[in-house]
Design a protein with these regions (language model features):
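Acidic/His- and Gly-rich active-site-bordering loop/insert found
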Residues: 2-127, 146-155, 327
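Acidic-enriched catalytic cores of C-N bond-cleaving enzymes acting on peptides and small amides
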Residues: 226-307, 335-357
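Short pre-catalytic strand/loop immediately N-terminal to key active-site residues, enriched for Gly-Thr
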Residues: 120-131, 391-395
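Zn-dependent metallopeptidase/amidohydrolase metal-coordination segment
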Residues: 216-218, 240, 307, 319-323, ...
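A short beta-alpha structural unit
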Residues: 329-332, 358-374, 398
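Acidic, glycine-rich active-site loops and adjacent beta-strand->loop/helix elements
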Residues: 99-101, 160-168, 191-196, 219-221, ...
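Short, solvent-exposed beta-strand/turn "edge" segments of beta-rich domains on protein surfaces
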Residues: 232-233, 314-321
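Acidic/histidine-rich catalytic neighborhood of metal-dependent amide-processing enzymes
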Residues: 124, 130-206, 460
Length: 460
């Protein structure tokens, strides 16, 4: 690197207002990728991102590409891809983020328009501000400045900005297959996670896997009068509620035979911090056993995330013949999601009350992830994060899942996969009033520029 650290920080600081303005422009595009929303917004977002990638001057060609969804004749949402090949002996770095966002949800809960960015108390509020449009701008802003801190750009660079991550990446596997050579890299940087807090950067080293499915419980062939038959005939919700109670121990830990735990090192973190960050009510206790971070990072969890039953306003005095639920299982690193799902299936078959009929549908599996932090790229990104923030970096687990990472690992088994991001505990990704800590965003650009400069000097 020909520039000093102070030069790097000054360059980023000088250009940061433009980066922030570009981020605001992206947030204004309601690029929700769910099938019930207007796909033209996602297409508009892809065009806007292609334009800012072109402005870096790093690439000769920037493309907007689509692939067919798995098991479908329908194309997925548009992705933005650009590639610059490396000089001989130099590594290629793939920079991933996604430009689609979650639906805004209940607008009445938002304190401002979700698609009109608002700065307040050092944060930028808006849907996608943190997840994941700031990740896009961290990549682009660092690339735009790279030529100012190295003599020649010798490393290879791939920019891959997906357009359907929030909808489960239905065309992702086909996309990797269709464009394998275009995307091939030695290092893959996934900017879709977060930091320990606004003062402490983190490298995400583990992610739980997931197994989600629809479960239907049937006890009757039609609804029955609750006075005429209640007390003698079980309804479907009664059976379902009894089943759910068997998922947990008295402490709230998952007690499903065959679901595994793993061992992980955890940084210092208290139950009080968890209470404060989660917003749990004062009267409510935390659940589970072991260190609170082990419960999130290295133990399984199971949650009913949706339920199809009559709403209170329209409920009649009947026994329900059928109940359907969406169930989410988080899988500890080290266990395959398929094995975890089979364990849950076996538990349900064994413990469903009253001999009720159960049907499984819409099963989606995503693998857990763990990375080797001894690789040269992991060491380089840790060093860059530490320099940018001026403090030690936390190796952090995340209780959530990023299922497409396992697709990256399968498609490019020799690549080092690094998971970074700009979120923090107050970002509220996927929730109303999502926000980005603006100073952390600037630090992320500094860190990425330092990392790319180090990669540029690396010989394979």
């Amino acid at each position: 690197m020909t520039a000093s650290f102070s030069d790097v920080r000054a360059l980023v600081s000088e250009s940061f207002p433009e980066s922030l303005e570009q981020l605001k422009n992206l947030v204004r595009i309601p690029s929700v990728s769910w099938s019930s929303f207007d796909p033209e917004n996602v297409a508009q977002s892809a065009e806007a991102i292609a334009d800012i990638v072109r402005e870096t001057g790093v690439f000769d060609k920037v493309q907007i590409l689509r692939s067919l969804k798995s098991d479908s004749s329908e194309f997925g949402q548009p992705a933005v891809v650009a590639r610059r090949n490396p000089a001989p002996g130099k590594p290629t770095i793939l920079l991933y983020a996604h430009h689609d966002v979650q639906p805004p949800g209940d607008l009445a809960v938002w304190e401002s328009d979700p698609f009109e960015p608002v700065e307040k108390n050092g944060r930028l509020y808006g849907r996608g501000a943190a997840d994941d449009k700031a990740g896009i701008l961290a990549h682009v802003s660092a690339l735009k400045l790279l030529s100012h801190v190295v003599e020649n750009i010798d490393l290879g660079v791939v920019v891959f900005i997906e357009g359907e991550e929030e909808f489960g990446s239905p065309s992702f596997d086909n996309f990797l297959q269709d464009h394998h050579d275009l995307l091939a890299a030695d290092v893959i940087v996934v900017a879709d996670s977060g930091n320990w807090n606004t003062e402490t950067p983190a490298l995400t080293t583990t992610l739980r896997g997931n197994a989600t499915f629809k479960l239907t419980v049937n006890t009757l062939d039609h609804a029955l009068h609750s006075g005429m038959f209640g007390g003698a005939v079980p309804d479907a919700f009664m059976a379902f509620a009894g089943l759910v109670s068997t998922f947990y121990s008295e402490s709230g830990s998952v007690q499903i035979e065959g679901l595994q735990k793993s061992s992980i090192q955890t940084p210092e973190y208290s139950d009080e911090q968890m209470r404060e960050e989660s917003g749990i009510l004062d009267s409510v206790s935390l659940i589970g056993d072991g260190h609170v971070l082990e419960r999130l990072w290295s133990q399984p969890s199971i949650t009913v995330t949706g339920l199809d039953i009559p709403d209170v306003a329209h409920a009649s005095n009947t026994l329900l013949p059928s109940v359907s639920a969406r169930i989410s299982v988080r899988v500890a690193p080290g266990q395959s999601s398929e094995d975890a799902f089979k364990a849950v299936q076996a538990h349900i078959a064994k413990h469903i009350p009253y001999g009720a009929e159960v049907v499984f549908d819409d099963v989606n599996l995503g693998e857990a992830f763990s990375t080797d932090t001894t690789g040269w790229a992991a060491q380089a990104v840790t060093s860059a994060l530490g320099q940018a923030w001026g403090t030690e970096v936390v190796d952090m687990g995340v209780g959530g899942s990023i299922p497409f990472i396992s697709s990256f690992v399968s498609a490019f088994p020799e690549a080092q996969v690094l998971v970074t991001g700009v979120e923090d505990p107050d970002s509220r990704a996927h929730s109303p009033n999502e926000s980005l800590h603006i100073a952390s965003f600037e630090q992320a650009i500094v860190a990425e520029l330092l990392f790319l400069a180090e990669c540029n000097s690396r010989e394979l």
